[in-house]
Amino acid sequence: MEYESVLIVKPEVFIYKIPPRASNRGYRAGDWNLKEPTWTGRMRLVAKGTAVVLKLEDKTSGALFANCPIDTYPGVAIEAVSDSSRYFVIRVQDDNGRSAFLGLGFGDRSDSFDLNVALQDHFKWVKNQEQIEKEKTEPKQELDLGFKEGETIKINMRITKKDGSEGSSRTGKNKGSSGVLPPPPGGLGKIAPPPAAAAANTTVRQSPGVSPAHRPAAGGSEWTDYASAGGNQGQQNSANANWVQF
């Protein structure tokens, strides 16, 4: 069992007789006699299930003046005019199914705005209900997330310790590589000079105050042996001479 729900109530609305539409440009409220409305009364927008009806009623007695069933919005049943936001063209129907088009006007723009919002919300709800019913009847397609035959995937894993640092192999690698090559063995020592140069440097350093002319010869020991040998030979000759003389 469905219950009626009142979506909106406006205590005062105006109804106008409108001329036939001259072209496809739409209705214009400026073509109506706005100062002399045909009828003035109350408007109620009532929903029953997915159906919604705009009812025009007497202010005092609540007697029904006209019904405007609305099957879609915007649509033929209710249409906004092209020159004002406060006026609409509605299609009213009697119990015999006869219909007529009338002009509907509000004294304030906020009233027409409320009617727009109420109709939009209702038909949005109807659309959602239809979608829910459609999902119930149609089987839902399940996604196949399994691997197909011959399909492989590649996973890159980065294992970390509990303290947040990386593995030991990578840590040791990072610590050992500082980015600077070590020096070659013995690279920091001086190159040894040749033996002759070393001896000359040693002689100069030991006797800095002796001139080259007074410096003793390098082969001093050999010269002494030679001189002593010559002296001994002279002594032997003199001895021989003395022996002859004797």
Curated annotation (Swiss-Prot):
Annotated Low complexity bias: 227-246
GO cellular component terms, semicolon-separated: clathrin vesicle coat; clathrin-coated pit
CDD domains the record matches: PHear_NECAP
Keywords on record: Endocytosis, Protein transport, Transport
GO biological process, one term: endocytosis
Comp. bias (Pro residues): 181-196
Positions of the UniProt region annotated as Disordered: 156-246
Motif WXXF motif location, chain numbering: 243-246
Biased composition (Polar residues): 166-177
Pfam families in the cross-refs: DUF1681
Superkingdom: Eukaryota
Similarity comment: family membership: Belongs to the NECAP family.
Domain-related comment: The WXXF motif mediates binding with the GAE domain of proteins.
Known role: May be involved in endocytosis.
Protein name (database record): NECAP-like protein CG9132
